[in-house]
């Protein structure tokens, strides 16, 4: 079985426990949309969507490959449309290898030029400066006759990490959820492979916040961070005067805490202001706030990790929303242990937290099994940081910081 470099849709929808609950949760999420903007975007995307599959478009893609690779090429079925990108499989006749031309979808993805430039630089940086396995990047450009594009080597794989973790009883059309019957040994083994990947990603340090830019063979943090949240920006429409007031106050208080530097210390040994700090014995010091940042990817999740027939990772895909970020983000346990978002869990955040906490124990055991790289110089084991992040609520703070769609739900639930 071969997997092309593809994405599952990961906008506001997310995995649900059953199809009915999924429909209800998605409907509630859509009620928060700006319907005028949604309609206009939909109409523009419908026109662009049709153009992606025209013969003339495919000929332009093949011609682009021939010019870059300096050999004849042909399109290979079939074109794959993901959540943010369209992928054209192409065979270079001279060398006989398959590549993929990956382009951000027009009228669906924002900041297409920046996104492609930054993703190309990130893949190149990881290939040169980490042990993370990424697709081989032949070429990338933010502007060409066909628009922003990358040429990547086609990746042969058996399945994705999401396939390995998901409930096999789900219908193909249903959005995936972690298999509730998965054997603990299998879960720990698969989690361990993801732990190793995150440790490899944690090792390189960067000097400031922003996106990587490549000039020649040199990389630097010189662009603004293009986040997933920017692509699906929440405009915070309000339902009533009370709703408007509550949202304003929540954001004002959040801004005030950030201005005082409290958010950086929250959930760490230096935290002397929060309610949690009075009841918990925290042992992990906060990371340095200057000249020590980590590469973070908003879209790093099991769906984008390809495995071979031994379930070894052959490639981590889709680095489009990757940027140098506060190290705190990397010291939280990953949200995707259950393969779905907490704010859209049909039984509510409390139930999500209970199920998540049980799986987090397995994740922490898997993390403790992994060896640290020489580049990680922290006073405590990484698993200790992850554990204290969950216990203190730092997990929720950072999650709400990155996701404006979830901010109000989380702030109301965890105001302390």
Predicted regions and their residues:
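Canonical protein kinase catalytic loop motif
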Residues: 296-302
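Intrinsically disordered, low-complexity intracellular terminal segments
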Residues: 168-182, 200, 212-296, 308-315, ...
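A structural signal for well-ordered alpha-helical scaffolds and beta->alpha junctions
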Residues: 58, 62, 116-120, 187, ...
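Alpha-helical structural context
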Residues: 67-68, 129, 413
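Active-site flanking residues adjacent to catalytic metal/cofactor-binding acidic residues
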Residues: 101, 298, 317
């Amino acid at each position: 079985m071969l997997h092309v470099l593809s994405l599952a849709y990961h906008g506001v929808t997310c995995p649900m426990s059953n199809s009915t609950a999924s429909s209800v949760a998605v409907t509630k999420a859509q009620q928060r949309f700006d319907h005028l903007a949604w309609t206009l975007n939909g109409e523009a995307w419908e026109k662009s969507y049709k153009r992606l599959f025209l013969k003339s478009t495919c000929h332009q893609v093949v011609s682009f490959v021939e010019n870059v690779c300096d050999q004849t090429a042909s399109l290979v079925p079939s074109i794959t449309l993901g959540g943010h990108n369209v992928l054209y499989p192409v065979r270079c006749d001279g060398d006989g290898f398959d590549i993929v031309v990956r382009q951000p979808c027009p009228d669906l993805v924002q900041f297409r030029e920046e996104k492609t430039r930054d993703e190309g630089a990130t893949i190149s940086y990881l290939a040169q400066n980490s042990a993370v396995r990424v697709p081989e990047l032949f070429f990338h450009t933010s502007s060409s006759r066909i628009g922003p594009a990358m040429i990547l080597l086609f990746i042969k794989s058996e399945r994705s990490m999401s396939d390995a973790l998901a409930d096999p009883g789900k219908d193909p059309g249903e959005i995936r959820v972690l298999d509730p019957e998965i054997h603990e040994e299998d879960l720990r083994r698969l989690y361990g492979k993801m732990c190793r990947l995150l440790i490899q990603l944690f090792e390189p340090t960067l000097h400031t916040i922003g996106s990587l830019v490549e000039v020649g063979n040199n990389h630097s943090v010189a662009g603004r961070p293009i986040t997933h949240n920017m692509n699906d920006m929440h405009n915070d429409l309000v339902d009533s005067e009370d709703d408007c007031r509550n949202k304003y106050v929540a954001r004002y208080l959040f801004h005030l805490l950030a201005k005082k530097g409290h958010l950086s210390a929250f959930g760490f040994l230096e935290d002397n202001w929060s309610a949690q700090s009075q009841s918990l014995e925290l042992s992990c010091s906060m990371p340095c706030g200057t000249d020590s940042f980590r590469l973070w990817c908003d879209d790093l999740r099991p769906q984008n990790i390809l495995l071979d027939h031994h379930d070894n990772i052959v490639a981590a895909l889709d680095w489009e929303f990757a940027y140098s970020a506060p190290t705190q983000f990397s010291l939280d346990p990953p949200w995707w242990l259950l393969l779905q978002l907490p704010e859209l869990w049909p039984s509510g955040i409390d139930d999500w937290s209970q199920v998540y906490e049980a799986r987090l124990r397995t994740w922490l055991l898997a993390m403790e099994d992994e060896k640290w790289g020489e580049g990680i110089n922290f006073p405590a084991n990484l698993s200790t940081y992850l554990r204290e992040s969950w216990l203190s609520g730092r997990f929720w703070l950072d999650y709400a910081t990155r996701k404006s769609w979830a901010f109000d739900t989380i702030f109301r639930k965890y105001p302390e």
